[in-house]
Amino acid sequence: MIIDRVEVETINSFWKLELLKEVYGLISILPILTLLLGITIEVLVIVWLEREISASIQQRIGPEYAGPLGLLQAIADGTKLLFKEDILPSRGDISLFSIGPSIAVISVLLSFLVIPLGYHFVLADLSIGVFLWIAISSIAPIGLLMAGYSSNNKYSFLGGLRAAAQSISYEIPLTFCVLAISLLSNSLSTVDIVEAQSKYGFFGWNIWRQPIGFLVFLISSLAECERLPFDLPEAEEELVAGYQTEYSGIKYGLFYLVSYLNLLVSSLFVTVLYLGGWNLSIPYISFFDFFQMNKAVGILEMTMGIFITLTKAYLFLFISITIRWTLPRMRMDQLLNLGWKFLLPISLGNLLLTTSFQLVSL
């Protein structure tokens, strides 16, 4: 069979088209891979910072042997957990036992979809961004409850129940605070919320317009992250390790990862909702606007936005780490009373007050 020149060119064009499709497919997943790499690095930095700050508060030496200044200690711990034996409970539900950590990790990772780290640097600028985060974050306690129930251990089961009760108690005040911010910004999009704060400069940040909501959001975020003084689901003195008691190896490492991912997500949302996101309200912004047509300056602006966002997030991280070594753990009844009898009425009153001001200003 003889193939003429036209057929050869047609075959080559189809081959090039398929090759282009593969290249476009790789390019489309590049932002996701970049974000995952950035999240991994951020978690390692947070673990190192927590150990160094905790050591400084307790007047002792922190990690110093694994790498320079102990920077590789988190990698060493993760590698150790990776090669540990994966022990399964003999009388537990093995399928639920294995699925629980995965649900918790995936639900937290999905929250990064709607977080704008910088100007035009967000994976999904959705019109319901903040509500999507609240909905996704409500899935994580289901994974913790599954982990506790499937372990066939009383300590694990109690820890799972505590995690579910704590999440339900503090999710509602958190939602009311987000609703108040959305009313001020006239949008549920995280990008629109940041841009609404940038209109009035530094004093347009929602921390000044919603101080009560900020405090409620801060406390509720710490409770959602299960940080001291709200770490009742894994209280060592009462429940050994809570829902993590029967876990070992990589599954235990996933729960360890979830706690720091939760802390990172909460810090970023505090920054986006109350601290102006990537905006700093200093003269360099007008300088970048003047040279907006330059692509290099646009990349520099995006990089500066990411740096500013992360710097503000680290402020919240420092506060949460300091609180861990400052306040004692609460009892379960105190935790529930704080959520239902104190934070819920305050957040509801703040929402009604914000709604009234918005109606009057129309």
UniProtKB/Swiss-Prot annotation:
**Keyword Lipoprotein on entry:** no
GO annotations under biological process? aerobic respiration; photosynthesis, light reaction
This one is known as NAD(P)H-quinone oxidoreductase subunit 1, chloroplastic
Class of enzymatic activity (EC top level): translocase
Provenance organism:
Triticum aestivum
> NCBIfam families annotated for this entry?
PRK06076.1-2
The source's superkingdom equals Eukaryota
Q: Which Pfam families match?
A: NADHdh
Per UniProt, what is the membrane topology?
A: Multi-pass membrane protein
Q: What's this protein's family per the entry?
A: Belongs to the complex I subunit 1 family.
Sorted alphabetically, which PROSITE patterns does this protein's record hold? COMPLEX1_ND1_1, COMPLEX1_ND1_2
**Where's it found, cell-wise?**
Plastid, Chloroplast thylakoid membrane
Question: EC annotation?
Answer: 7.1.1.-
The residue ranges crossing the membrane are: 29-49, 103-123, 128-148, 164-184, 202-222, 247-267, 303-323, 335-355
